């Protein structure tokens, strides 16, 4: 997969969450739970993906531009998000 991001946003994300967008290459898409981010009327479709990086759950907000994933945010999942992921990912695999 190809990734891109705004460098200013990359640094503000690191300051806020302590996570570098470069870590997106380790995002485990095979175990990803993806939902559309419809909270606001964005200029393009946005998605929130929950997946592990090195045995820790992360949340990536991104948009697709052709065959490139444009990272908007990447951070460690909080406890509520971990619980959401566990319950929903298990339900997906049960079907």
Identify the function of each model-found stretch.
Residues 1-95:
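Ribonuclease/tRNase effector modules and their secretory precursors
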